[in-house]
Structures are given as C-alpha cells and as structure tokens.
Amino acid sequence: MACDLTLGRKEPCKKVVGGIKEVYFVSFGNLTNVGYDSVDTDVINTISESALAYRYEVRGSSSFTQNIQTSRQNSSTSFEQVLELSLKKLSKEDNREIKKMSSGRFHVFVIDYNNNIFVAGLDNGLQVTDGNIFTGGYKITLKGEERTPANFLGNSIDSLGFIVNLSEDGVQFMERVQLDNGEIVSISCVNKINN
C-alpha cells in the first residue's frame, strides 16, 4: 500500500538552529520547468526559467511552518504553508513593495539557519493573508495550501543560476540582472537596446 511507512527515525544530535534567514520571491507561474531528483521526488534539482526573483533578508523572528491538515471524513490530506516575516524599519519604498506583495501570489524559496532551502507555494503559490505596519517595521503573513510539504532544493541557490544584484537584490534565473536608473532590467534587454 502506498501509505505504508518505509523508514524509521533516530533521535538526531542537538545541532540544529531554528528560524529562517532569507527568502526569495518569484511571481506565481514563473517556475514551470522544475526538475526533480530521479530517486527522491521530495528534492528539486533544477529549475530552468528566467523568472525574476527578489531576496529579503529576514533574520530574527521570521518563521516558516507547515501545518498538516488531514480529514478522515473525505480522505484528504493537505499541507498549509505559513511564512511569517518580520521586516525591520519603515520606508516609502518598502510600503510600495508591501502593497504589491499584498495583491500578488508567489513561489517562495525559504532558507533556514541550517542552510536547508525549501520551495514553498510550488503548485498553488503563497499569498498575503495578514499583516501589520507599525513604527518599527512590518509583520507579514503569507499562506498557501499544497498537496505535499515544501520540496527541498537539492542544490544551492547559486547553482540554479541566481545572480544577486547587491544594489537592489534583484535576482534573475539564467540571465544577469543590471540596475538601470533604479529599475532592474535583464542584460538581454540592455543588449537589444545597445545593438
């Protein structure tokens, strides 16, 4: 039967650290070519897209939780993915981005303090469901419901072709990102303009 367990589990050593340190937001629908590990389908090895992503450093009280929701009545199981972000300091630029984030749906790469990378909202995306703006910054909650827990990313973010623009933290899969008068554009667009 497919529901039967296949492995036991020992108590691990006390060397893990809780919490998350950064997240990467990708607009929903821009991760269509996902390659899974041939042996372990809970691991994603490749993503071959040129979707723009944005990195948020979230050290401190931010968290990523996956709640198992199961019902005996209708024989269903789903995984509620909850990303709670605590963003320090207010700015007019952040206000603008929070408004956009509140209206959108995203795939989110979550990196914890143990350097595990989770791909949250892979099939259905995460959306802002709650939040607060206060004098010290922002608290934002994003939620999504998936058929499986968030997949682990088998490689590093860098191995997927992410190139981080440190000025604006724009990230581009497979294409370099360049800062141009405060707007992020891909090198291919710049080359078309220059040629």
Residue ranges and their predicted role:
Residues 2-80, 124-133:
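Solvent-exposed edge beta-strands and adjacent loop segments
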Residues 22-24, 108, 175-177:
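Short polybasic amphipathic segments
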Residues 24-27, 35, 117, 161, ...:
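Intrinsic disorder/low-structure terminal segments
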Residues 62-123:
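Structured, beta-strand-rich domain cores
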Residues 123-194:
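Mixed-charge, glycine-accented linear interaction segment located at domain edges/termini
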